[in-house]
């Protein structure tokens, strides 16, 4: 019974706010909607999948003349893929594999399944399957703790956190920050199971260091008035990677999005608490992205120092550098691409940040070159390459430098999402490929010997990837000057053969024009 009690809370229902407040009209039809459908803030394509997992809202919609989603009610079979009842043909998407990586498997079908579990909604399915109760409520509404393997994701109710005696220093992820009795709940703790989950104890891979001190308390924190502050809203705890690097920081955001799926809740009426044991602030160049996940400013843990804080509902988010996690530490099977998970993430963020597709206009292929104002990896003959591109009448060419002080992140996203061919040197700025339209191509002009990084990210997102092929057609300024390693290809600048460059860009353009989602069907004879 207690197991059912705990797991029943894992997939919370979206509250039917206003359901009892709508006054009926004389003809029996409610004058106002029975549910605030606008509060879902989901892309239209995601609505049937949301209704599949929230049948109570589907039921209300069926009864509500104001519901805008009635067209989806006749078929609620569409599912993300991690639901136990989900049939493969109704999944949000399924990877495409073009060849078999014999180091992993021997058939295309099994390759698809491997890739789906590695990097698609199958990854969320595996986290859901791992969930087990570590602290069982003694009675209804008592505390609980449920976690996936290695404590990579946890969900707690009525959790107590005592920060009256903590000591902060320069360490952002101090492992002994909280002691026994300073974190816990009123529930029956399976201490043996808890302590067996420490194999991947590491700051950005697990919550084990933070939760190994979880204590079975002899008091009910909230009911017994043991809290200086009670947080009523659901709260996501996160340990964040580098906020000044888009590649690393978006590992935070994609894992928060996966966590929302595991939690079956996409509400923005939640708090995000940055678990940071230092006294430092956090530099975040991409802070606008939080608007896709929360209505409030991110809270630093130190905000609660010297207090006993109780959280009615706490979620410990999946982390950015987990072993076999997404997407920093992911060994991927070759030959496969296009995950529904990363496409859904892109759609979700763009929708909530109000980034729209404005073209292409007049059949032009929009080519964006990402320039660098940093010391290294500059394109030395950039003007020559741009002039060559401008000789193609169907190209609309622009050069951008995504310097945060001059161009805000939302403006950067608008440019990226309205680009058909995105060109740039190896670097974190290429993470923008996550927000290209589905038909787009990304051209990593030179990967500087790091062959997998953005190739794999493009495969995850499902956009076409090309990079420089012929070493005798690229000309480094020198051998590179790494501050400690000496010669290094990432620490110099490059010139490129114009003819080879145009050959590769025209290949990318051909891909864009032939993509089934390319919205402009006119023949581009100039190409």
From Swiss-Prot:
Motif (Required for optimal activity): 295-297
The keyword Cell membrane belongs to this UniProt entry's keyword annotation: no
EC supergroup of this enzyme: transferase
GO CC annotation, single: endoplasmic reticulum lumen
PROSITE patterns: ER_TARGET (PS00014)
Compartments (UniProt record): Endoplasmic reticulum lumen
Known EC number: 2.4.1.255
InterPro entries: Glyco_transf_61_cat (IPR049625), Glycosyltransferase_61 (IPR007657)
One Gene Ontology molecular-function label: protein O-acetylglucosaminyltransferase activity
Residues modified by glycosylation: 354
Signal peptide: 1-17
Pfam families, A to Z: Glyco_transf_61
Keywords per UniProt: Endoplasmic reticulum, Glycoprotein, Glycosyltransferase, Signal, Transferase
Motif Prevents secretion from ER: where in chain: 524-527
Primary location recorded for the protein, binned into one broad class: endoplasmic reticulum
Family named by the database record: Belongs to the glycosyltransferase 61 family.
Name used for this protein in its record: EGF domain-specific O-linked N-acetylglucosamine transferase
Native species: Bos taurus
């Amino acid at each position: 019974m207690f197991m059912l009690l705990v797991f029943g809370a894992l997939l919370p229902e979206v509250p039917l706010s206003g359901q009892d407040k709508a006054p009926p009209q004389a003809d029996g039809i409610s004058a106002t909607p029975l549910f605030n459908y606008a509060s879902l803030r989901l892309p239209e394509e995601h609505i049937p999948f949301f209704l599949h997992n929230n049948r109570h809202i589907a039921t209300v919609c069926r009864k509500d003349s104001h519901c805008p989603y009635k067209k989806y009610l006749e078929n609620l079979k569409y599912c993300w893929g991690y639901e136990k009842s989900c049939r493969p043909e109704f999944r949000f998407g399924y990877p495409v594999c073009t060849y078999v990586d014999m180091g992993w498997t021997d058939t295309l079908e099994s390759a698809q399944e491997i890739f789906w579990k590695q990097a698609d909604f199958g990854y969320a399915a595996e986290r859901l399957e791992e969930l087990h109760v570590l602290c069982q409520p003694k009675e209804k509404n008592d505390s609980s703790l449920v976690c996936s393997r290695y404590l990579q994701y946890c969900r707690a109710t009525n959790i107590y956190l005592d920060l009256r005696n903590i000591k902060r220093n320069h360490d952002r992820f101090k492992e002994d920050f909280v002691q026994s009795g300073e974190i816990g709940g009123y529930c029956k703790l399976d201490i043996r199971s808890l302590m067996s989950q420490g194999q991947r104890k590491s700051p950005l891979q697990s919550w084990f260091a933070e939760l190994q001190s979880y204590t079975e308390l002899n008091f009910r924190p909230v009911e017994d008035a043991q809290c200086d502050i009670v947080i009523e809203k659901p709260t996501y705890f996160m340990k964040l990677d580098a906020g000044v690097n888009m590649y690393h920081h978006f590992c935070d955001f994609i894992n928060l999005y996966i966590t929302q799926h595991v939690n079956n809740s996409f509400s923005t009426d939640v708090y995000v608490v940055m678990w940071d044991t230092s006294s430092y602030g956090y530099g975040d160049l991409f802070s606008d992205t939080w608007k896709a996940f929360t209505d409030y400013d991110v809270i630093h843990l130190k905000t609660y120092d010297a207090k006993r804080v109780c959280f009615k509902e706490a979620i410990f988010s999946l982390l950015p550098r987990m072993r076999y996690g997404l997407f920093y530490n992911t060994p991927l099977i070759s030959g496969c691409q296009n995950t529904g998970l990363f496409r859904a993430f892109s759609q979700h963020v763009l929708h909530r940040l109000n980034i729209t597709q404005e073209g292409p206009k007049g059949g032009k292929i929009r080519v964006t070159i990402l320039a660098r104002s940093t010391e290294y990896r500059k394109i030395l003959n950039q003007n020559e390459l741009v002039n060559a591109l401008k000789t193609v009448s169907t190209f609309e060419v622009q050069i951008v430098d995504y310097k945060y002080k001059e161009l805000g992140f939302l403006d950067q996203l608008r440019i990226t999402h309205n680009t058909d061919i995105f060109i740039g040197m190896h670097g974190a700025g290429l993470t923008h490929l996550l927000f290209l339209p589905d038909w787009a191509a990304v051209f990593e002009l030179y990967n500087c010997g790091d062959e997998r990084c953005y190739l794999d990210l493009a495969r995850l997102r499902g956009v076409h990837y090309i990079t420089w092929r012929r070493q005798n057609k690229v000309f480094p300024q020198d051998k590179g000057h790494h501050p400690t390693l000496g010669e290094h290809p990432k620490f110099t600048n490059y010139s490129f053969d114009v003819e080879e460059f145009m050959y590769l860009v025209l290949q990318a353009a051909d891909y864009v024009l032939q993509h089934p989602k390319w919205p402009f069907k006119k023949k581009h004879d100039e190409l």
